[in-house]
């Protein structure tokens, strides 16, 4: 069989290369060989018929929880990678809040070995900022980088010590690593379980004020100014955080940000509308309509650089409890494109900006070799049917997690083929619609 693959007749949208039009993508030896309007295909070459579909660089997710090692009952590297390619993601960054925490080469190497064995999405480990993510002592950043980590995070836990955060930014700068941080002041969070506002009052649930996020973002931007370190703000959810990041960028500081599909599409009112469903419990919590508008505008104008899923699978035991006691987080790899395509249809995003925020935008944040269909680039490609409608059935998801707020929803937009390094690693089963 020929080692050449042709993706024919699709609308190629590649913001990194400035391409948007019907083209044929030619893949040879795992690399993009050509993107052209007219190419003659040899008789023995393989082909994907992409007519009436989008062809984009494979999506890049800066924020996923693969749970391995230590929590394989929730997810494994293999099942998470399978969910990723089903959603069009060819590269994912694995957060370090595993058991044990990824604060050393041994854990990083295990994650990479599991990813290689799965042979699906590319997995880029993120190492811990502090040993055990306990916020007391810095991890060995040189060791983490040498073993394959692309960024550092204590995700799920904020770095409460300003002194430690300062040292982390300085130390990480020496190794060229960004810090991707979970921003919340635990003293303001207290025992809150949802956004502090009228909805929380009506529901009788303890609230988390927006300022819990805002003050930490402002603190860390000040520390970036002091140290010159690179800061990436994870799962931005408030208008105040957006304003702070926008101003930091205006001043030329090395600050970037991401936003999740659920913080773009849902509000705190959805908690009550769902009947206290724990599939609507996450951290940061779903915010107000004003916050959602601010996040949408920030993504559209480039203040926020990337869409990231914060894919967080949990077992039924951890979710099928009262709202206060339930684990935070939802799965998102397989629904992200569909949910965000809804924003395009509402006029909140352009098609080009959507693709950019899922491809070259995140790739640039962590300096990953991804997000483009330029000649010579790795042939990581998503073929997408923007018109296909499907019903979200948790039992049909590839992730072990079933915790999705989109359960039973009819969504539009489906990944039909995912290609990694020139290999077709996912083809849609239309029965899943």
Swiss-Prot record:
One of its GO terms (cellular component) is cytoplasm. It is an enzyme of class 3 (hydrolase). It comes from the Bacteria. GO terms for biological process: 'de novo' UMP biosynthetic process; purine nucleobase catabolic process. Keywords: Hydrolase, Metal-binding, Pyrimidine biosynthesis, Zinc. Zn(2+) 2 binds at residues 155, 182, 235. The active site is at 310. Binds 2 Zn(2+) ions per subunit. Its EC number is 3.5.2.3. Substrate binds at residues 65-67, 97, 283, 314. The keyword Metal-binding applies. Pfam families: Amidohydro_1 (PF01979). Zn(2+) 1 binds at residues 63, 65, 155, 310. Its cofactor is Zn(2+). Pathway: Pyrimidine metabolism; UMP biosynthesis via de novo pathway; (S)-dihydroorotate from bicarbonate: step 3/3. Disulfide bonds: none annotated. Catalyzes the reversible cyclization of carbamoyl aspartate to dihydroorotate. NCBIfam families: pyrC_multi. PANTHER family: ALLANTOINASE (PTHR43668:SF2). Belongs to the metallo-dependent hydrolases superfamily. DHOase family. Class I DHOase subfamily. This is Dihydroorotase. It comes from Anaeromyxobacter dehalogenans (strain 2CP-1 / ATCC BAA-258).
